[in-house]
Amino acid sequence: MAGAPRGRGGGGGGGGAGESGGAERAAGPGGRRGLRACDEEFACPELEALFRGYTLRLEQAATLKALAVLSLLAGALALAELLGAPGPAPGLAKGSHPVHCVLFLALLVVTNVRSLQVPQLQQVGQLALLFSLTFALLCCPFALGGPAGAHAGAAAVPATADQGVWQLLLVTFVSYALLPVRSLLAIGFGLVVAASHLLVTATLVPAKRPRLWRTLGANALLFLGVNVYGIFVRILAERAQRKAFLQARNCIEDRLRLEDENEKQERLLMSLLPRNVAMEMKEDFLKPPERIFHKIYIQRHDNVSILFADIVGFTGLASQCTAQELVKLLNELFGKFDELATENHCRRIKILGDCYYCVSGLTQPKTDHAHCCVEMGLDMIDTITSVAEATEVDLNMRVGLHTGRVLCGVLGLRKWQYDVWSNDVTLANVMEAAGLPGKVHITKTTLACLNGDYEVEPGHGHERNSFLKTHNIETFFIVPSHRRKIFPGLILSDIKPAKRMKFKTVCYLLVQLMHCRKMFKAEIPFSNVMTCEDDDKRRALRTASEKLRNRSSFSTNVVQTTPGTRVNRYIGRLLEARQMELEMADLNFFTLKYKQAERERKYHQLQDEYFTSAVVLALILAALFGLVYLLIIPQSVAVLLLLVFCICFLVACVLYLHITRVQCFPGCLTIQIRTVLCIFIVVLIYSVAQGCVVGCLPWSWSSSPNGSLVVLSSGGRDPVLPVPPCESAPHALLCGLVGTLPLAIFLRVSSLPKMILLAVLTTSYILVLELSGYTKAMGAGAISGRSFEPIMAILLFSCTLALHARQVDVKLRLDYLWAAQAEEERDDMEKVKLDNKRILFNLLPAHVAQHFLMSNPRNMDLYYQSYSQVGVMFASIPNFNDFYIELDGNNMGVECLRLLNEIIADFDELMDKDFYKDLEKIKTIGSTYMAAVGLAPTAGTKAKKCISSHLSTLADFAIEMFDVLDEINYQSYNDFVLRVGINVGPVVAGVIGARRPQYDIWGNTVNVASRMDSTGVQGRIQVTEEVHRLLRRGSYRFVCRGKVSVKGKGEMLTYFLEGRTDGNGSQTRSLNSERKMYPFGRAGLQTRLAAGHPPVPPAAGLPVGAGPGALQGSGLAPGPPGQHLPPGASGKEA
C-alpha cells in the first residue's frame, strides 16, 4: 500500500492505498498493515487527504488558540502604546499593533465557522503566518523615533538589542506549535524572523562594538533554542498523531477484513439453515442457557406440500465416475434442481444420494404450494428428459407428492442439517417409491388443492406398494398436456448429425454437459455466498449511513473495491460524521481524564517513545543557557554550580532512560516516573534561567519617601538611579521566559500538572521582579513599557504554553480514543469471527469449512476429495417408529422428536472427547446416525498406517453408543434398541448444491455400510469381512454371522462385533480410560453388548431391505429415512 509518508529522499512514487508501492507492515501483533509515519505527509495523496480531514477539527481548535494568543499580544502592546507609556523608540511598530490586533481578530472570527474545510483552514493559517511575519518585522529595533542617543524630556529612548526579542520568540513558537501550516513554511518563518532581527540589530542599533557580537550571539542562541524546540514539538506531535491515525486505520482495515470474513461465514450459515432457525441456534450456541434437557429447534407447519424425487438409472452411471466427475455431475444436476426450486418457491431440504426432496410453503406460507410442487416435479422431469435426449443415456425421474403437516428444524448438537419429519413426509416418500419414471405421483389430498388446474389419471399406487394398499390411499398421475419447457443446447434435434456424440463412458457425458452450459448454469457451492449481491450492497450502505451518525460504532458494510481504497472511503465517511462534541463527552472538561477509569489506566500504560528525546532536548537548552550565561551575563559561583549540576543530571537521565529502554522499557518508566522527571527537569532548567535573572537584578534598591528608588551608600547621600546596574538584565529575563519551554516537549505528560507548574513558575518570576525592585527601578512606580513588558511576556508565554499543553493533551487523548474504539470493534469482530467459525465447524467438517473461507470466490472450484480407506458407520434405532405418534397430547409428534433430539445430542456429546476427535458426524437421517472416520486430510502412507486405529476409534464409539442409549432408556423408561453397521473402503467426499450446499460422502462403501445396518440385528454391530480383518488383531471379539444377501452386492460374509476384551479374555465395553461407566448395576440393567443377545435369524431368512428403519440407498447413499414411516411401513425402494 503506497501509504508511507515521504522521506527526505522523496519517497513519493506510491499509488493508491492498497497497491504494492511503498507498502510497509507495522511490527505489531498479528502483522497488521502499518504505514510508517516518518515525515510531514504520506506518499499517497488520498491517505494524506484523509489525515488532513481527520485532524481538521483539532487543527481548527489549535488555530483558534494561536489567533487568540496573537490577538492578545497585539492588543496588549496596542494598549500599552495607547496609554503612552515611555519605552524604547517605537520605530515602524508605531500604530501597527491595533491594526494587527484587528486582523488577528478577524481571522479568529473566520476560523470559528463550523463548516470550515481543510483548504480554507490552510489559507487561514497562511494568512495568520503572513500577518505574524509583518508583526514580527515591525517589532524589530529600527529606531526611527529620532536620532540616536537620549533626548532630554523626550518620550523615546534609544533602541536596544533586546527590543522585540520576546515578541519574536513568542510568535515563532506559536507558528510552530499551533498554526496549521506546513513544517517547511514554519521553519522558513522562524529563520526569516530570527535573521531579520539579528540583521536589524547589527546595523541599526547603536552599541559598543566590542560588546555587540556578544549581544548578537545571545540573541542568536535564544532564537536557536526556540526554533529547535518549535521544530521538535511540531514534528513529534505530528508524528504521534500520524501514528495514532495509522493505528486506527490499520484497526479499521482489519475490522473491515474481519467483517468480510464474518459476512462470508454468515452467508455460509444462512445457506445451510433458514435465517430464523440459524439466528436462534447461534445465540444459544454462543451463550448456552442453563437447562436440564437440550433445546429442540422444531417448528410446526400445518399446510405444506412435500416433494420426493429420485433419479432412475443414476446408480449405474455414477458407479463409473471418478471423484471429480461424480461431484461435478451431482452438482450440475442438483444445482439445476436448486434453481428450479427457487423459481417454483420450494425449499430444498436434503439430498440423499440421488434422492432430492423439497417442501413448498415452509419458510414463506403460500396458498398455491401444491401448484408449486407440481410445477417443480414437472420441471425436474423435463430437465432429466433433456439430459437423456442430449446424451443418449437412459435417465429418468420419479416424483412423489403429498400435502399435509410437517415438523421442520434441526436435531442434535453437531453437524446441523435442516430436515422435516411427520407421517405426511413419510407418505410423500412412499409416493415417490410407488411412482413410475417420468410421472408426477400425487395423493388425493394434493389433488384437492390443485382445484382442477391439471389433468390427471389414476395412479394405482396401491398395486405397487403395500403401505398405500394397507392405508387405502388413492393416488393419481399428473398428465402434462405438452412438452412444457425446451432447454436450448440439450435437445437432440439441435445437435448436428456430424457433431452428435455417442456416449460410451461417463467422461463423455460430463464433457457434453459442460458444452451445454446454456441450460446448466449451476453455481459452485458457496460461491454465491462469498460476495455481496446488489441488494445486499444497497441494504448495507443504508445501514452504514445510519450507523455513521453514532461515532462510537464502526459497524458497516462497504461495497467491495480495492482493499486500501475501500478502507479510505470508509474512513472518509466516518470523518464526515465525526462530531468532536461527542468525543469530548468521554473526557473530563477540566482534567481531560477519561471518564472510564479503565481507559485512563490503559492510556497511561502507553509507551512514550519521545521521552528520551525530550530529555536530550532539555539538555541542549540547558547548554544554550550556559552559553548565554558565559557570553553576556556576569558569572557567579552559585549559578555555575547549578548549571553544572543541571547538565550532569540531564546526562544521567539520558543514560538511565537508555538503559531502561534496553532492559525493561516501558515497564520501568511509568507515567508517575515520567511526570516526576518532567517536573524536576523543568524546575531545574528554570532555576538555572532564574539564577541568571537574580544575579542581574538590583536587590540593593529601596524606596524613598517620595516613591523614587535610591541606593544606600556609606556617604549618606541618596542619589536616584534611573537604570539598573546590570546591562544584561533583559537577556537574563529572556532566559527566564525561554526556561519555561521544556514543558512543551514532554508530550505525554498530562496537561493538568503542566498548567499547575506553569502557574508556580509564572508566580515566582513575577515575585522575583517585584521583590527585587526591578519594576520600580524601570518605571519609577508608573506603568512603563520597560517595567511592564517582562510581566506581560511571562503571562503571554505561560498562556501560550498552557493552551498548547491542553491542545496536545486533547489531541493525544482523542487520537487514542479513536484508535481504541477502532481496536475494540476490531476485537469484537474477531470474537464474532471465532464464534461464527465455531458454528461453521459445527455445520461442516473443519477442513471443508476452512477451504471455503480461505478460497477466492472468483477462483473457487468444486470441493471434492477421494479417500482410499474410510470407516463408515450407520447406527439406527429401528423401534423408534413404534414410539413416534402424532397426537394433540404430544403436540403432533413434537414431544417424540424431543426425545430423539436428546438421544442424538447425547451421541454428539460423545464426539467431544479427545479420543473421538478423528470422528466426523456426517448427518442424521430420521433416527439413523451416520458417522465416518479417516476424512481428515492426511498423507497417503500415514492414512494407510492409521486405518486400523481409525476403525478402532469407530468401533469404540459404536460400543459406547449402546451405553448412552441404555442410560437414556433407564431414565426415560423406554426400550429403544440400537442397530449398527460398519464398513471400510474408498469413498468420495464433496460439497454439492449451489443454493443449499451440503457436505456428503458417496460410494460403494457408504452403500454397504448402510446395508450392514438395514440387514443387521437389533442390539448388534454388524461389520463387513474387511472390517473384521483389520480389527481382529486388536482386543475385539467377533462372532461370524455368515453370508447375508445384500442388495446390489449379492452374498456377503458379515460378522457381529461383540465388544472389547481385556488381557484376561473377559469382555468389556472399552479400554479407553475416558469412558463414562454408567452405574447400570444399580437397576440390574446391563449394556446390550454385554448382555445376552436375542437369537439371530438365519441369514438366508432375513427380509433384505424390509422392515422399519431399513435404509436402502439407490446406489450412492442411503435413501430417505424409514424412520419417517409409521409402524408397518417400509423404507424407500429404489
UniProtKB/Swiss-Prot annotation:
GO terms for cellular component: cytoplasm; glutamatergic synapse; hippocampal mossy fiber to CA3 synapse; membrane raft; plasma membrane; postsynaptic density membrane; presynapse; Schaffer collateral - CA1 synapse. Glycans are attached at N706. Residues 1-65, 237-612, 798-1134 are cytoplasmic. Activated by G(s) G alpha protein GNAS. Inhibited by G(i) G alpha protein GNAI1. Is further activated by the complex formed by GNB1 and GNG2. Activated by calcium/calmodulin. Inhibited by the ATP analogs adenosine, 2'-deoxyadenosine and 2'-deoxy-3'-AMP. Detected in brain cortex (at protein level). Detected in brain. InterPro entries: A/G_cyclase, A/G_cyclase_CS, AC_N, Adcy, Nucleotide_cyclase. Residues 495-522, 1027-1050 are annotated as: Interaction with calmodulin. Residues 1-21 have a biased composition (Gly residues). PROSITE patterns: GUANYLATE_CYCLASE_1, GUANYLATE_CYCLASE_2. GO terms for molecular function: adenylate cyclase activity; ATP binding; calcium- and calmodulin-responsive adenylate cyclase activity; calmodulin binding; metal ion binding. Its cofactor is Mg(2+); Mn(2+). Residues 697-726 are extracellular. It is found in: Membrane; Cell membrane; Cytoplasm; Membrane raft. Gene3D superfamilies: Nucleotide cyclase (3.30.70.1230). CDD domains: CHD. Its EC number is 4.6.1.1. Mg(2+) 2 binds at D310, I311, D354. Binds 2 magnesium ions per subunit. Is also active with manganese (in vitro). Pfam families: AC_N, Guanylate_cyc. It comes from the Eukaryota. One of its GO terms (biological process) is intracellular signal transduction. Catalyzes the formation of the signaling molecule cAMP in response to G-protein signaling. Mediates responses to increased cellular Ca(2+)/calmodulin levels. May be involved in regulatory processes in the central nervous system. May play a role in memory and learning. Plays a role in the regulation of the circadian rhythm of daytime contrast sensitivity probably by modulating the rhythmic synthesis of cyclic AMP in the retina. Interacts with CALM. Belongs to the adenylyl cyclase class-4/guanylyl cyclase family. This is Adenylate cyclase type 1.
